[in-house]
A protein has these predicted regions:
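RecB-family 4Fe-4S metal-dependent nuclease core
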Residues: 1-393
Length: 393
């Protein structure tokens, strides 16, 4: 892909990930804290929003590796699949059921406060939610999966942006061959509390996976398959479905609609008694499953609130724009490194958007007042060093 190679574009060498580029664009000083100083936010005992995603990614990865291995399409796989910082890891040939069993054990070792935090956010204990989500995910995409040949899972890639001295690298959740369309696709899996409305245009402008498709091109050449022509997004809702409720008259309560078809059918079972509106009980009865409700819950509109996928073509023009932007940002990063070495700090992007939710905000304010050469204990600002032996100023 042709890129500008003017002398001012050439950097001695800079290696970057998408996350690094994004953070530097937000604020060079925040980038310095993370990538030069090695600072991270202190981990709390429980971070269910983040941790559930890690657990589901592990289940999903082993599911896809198993499929690729069984069908003989798998070209590459990691040695291990990880869950959370405090959770277990698994060999590449483990099964999803191994993760389920480990989740039960992990849950059993959590303290009462940690469990409460999980339940408040997730709506169910981790083992039950993980099992339900995985089962429903397989049911939802089973037919589509028959047309997919898994090539790689958790695949690392790196590639130089031509003529710039910039090397980009990252990890792709999955690379697969779409047998129906005859193309190779890079897929990104995302979990979130609820699934909002995401358009194809939004996903096309998400440069991360577009860049990954570009970065994986040479590996696809080595594997003897075509280079990626599309990117896919596999979105999964984390929060558990609610339990349906009945009114006294035996009607579904309008106040609770946030449940899926499986939850509804399990709740109904052989029927749910209701007391009726009359005091003598003569209007009591048993609620049974309604065909209209089953049809509603099985509709694409409702199902997409729990699981959603989109396929977006790789645009060479879009990729070129993002590569040029990446090279430009890496040029800025090189300047940040020089300034940080000389002055002990970097440029700051002042403003509510950059500072309001920045994990380094408290330390940043302290150093603006006291200067970068003072003594600042990371833990006093809710931070920790990635390297435990690091001694900060």
């Amino acid at each position: 892909m042709a890129m500008s190679t003017q002398p001012q574009d050439v950097i001695d060498e800079e290696r970057a990930t998408y996350s690094s580029l994004t953070l530097h664009r937000r604020c060079p000083q925040a980038w310095k804290y993370r990538y030069i100083d090695g600072l991270r936010r202190q981990r709390s005992e429980t971070t269910p929003a983040l941790d559930f995603g890690s657990w589901f990614h592990a289940v999903r990865a082993l599911d896809r590796i198993s499929k690729g291995w069984a069908e003989g399409t798998l070209k590459a796989h990691p040695d291990e699949i990880y869950t959370t910082d405090t959770g277990p890891s698994f060999p590449w040939d483990a099964s999803p059921s191994d993760v389920m069993a480990a989740a039960v054990e992990y849950w059993g070792h959590l303290g009462e406060d940690a469990r409460e935090a999980w339940l408040d956010w997730l709506g169910q204990p981790l083992p039950q939610r993980l099992s339900h989500t995985y089962r429903e995910w397989r049911e939802r995409w089973g037919q589509d999966s028959e047309n997919e040949g898994v090539l790689a899972v958790e695949q690392r890639w790196e590639r130089e942006v031509p003529g710039t001295g910039v090397v980009l690298w990252g990890y792709a959740d999955e690379v697969y061959q779409d047998r129906k369309r005859g193309i190779v696709v890079v897929r990104d899996c995302k979990t979130s509390g609820t699934l909002g409305q995401v358009t194809s245009l939004d996903e096309m402008m998400d440069s991360q996976v577009q860049l990954y498709a570009w970065g994986l091109g040479p590996l696809c050449d080595e594997w003897g398959v075509p280079r990626p022509r599309a990117v896919a997004f596999d979105r999964v809702r984390s929060k558990a479905p609610k339990t349906p409720k009945l009114t006294k008259a035996g009607k579904l309560s309008a106040s609770v609609k946030d449940y899926d078809l499986t939850t509804y059918l399990d709740w109904v079972g052989d029927g749910v008694p209701f007391e009726g509106m009359k005091k003598d009980g003569s209007a009591a009865g048993v609620y049974t499953a309604e065909e209209a409700e089953i049809e509603r819950l099985g509709s694409p509109q409702v199902v997409s609130q729990w699981f959603a996928r989109h396929l977006t073509p790789v645009s060479p023009y879009l990729v070129r724009s993002h590569l040029q932007a990446a090279a430009d940002t890496c040029g800025d990063i090189s300047l940040t490194r020089k300034r940080a070495e000389r002055r002990g700090e970097a440029a700051r992007n002042f403003g509510k958007a950059a500072c309001q939710f920045c994990e380094f905000a408290d330390l940043c304010r302290a150093q603006m007042v006291g200067g970068p050469d003072g003594e600042y204990a990371a833990e006093e600002y809710g931070l920790r060093y990635r390297d435990p032996d690091h001694s900060g100023r």
